[in-house]
Amino acid sequence: MAQAFNLVADSVAPERGMYAYMPNAPQEHNNIFYSAVQTDTIQAGDFMKLSATSTNTACPVVEKCAIADVPYGMVVYDCRVNAHKVGERVALAKSGEIVWLVANGEINVGSKLQMINGTVYVDDTTTSASAYVGVAVTKANAQGDLIQVKLDFNLGVAG
């Protein structure tokens, strides 16, 4: 008898910033996005840090990481929006969670990864003074491949 709907198939097309496993895991979803530039936006897969200037006592306020900032979390894929605006609440994936990210080139399993500033990519080429964001769980063969990454913000900054 043929199955009408396969609940265990892995045929859902992954997107940058989407959870690879346990998409219904508890997540920190009440972070407020801040930027001094009111027209700035963030997208799934962007890495965020806690805002050092926040005086909010109700929930975390986050801003986009610079290349040397150690992340607090990564913006999770949301099928309802392409980008989040300043002042909106965003969900963040945290250390230990496995997400889909875009490779800058060939990456081997187990490689420590850094974000490439100003792009959507992660790479295993260590750049001095750049923060690590996690470890490759699957292999990438070329630039643009989606790979599974176990987020680990405790790896610190290179060099």
Predicted regions and their residues:
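Surface-exposed, low-hydrophobicity beta-strand/loop segments enriched in small/polar/acidic residues
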Residues: 1-159
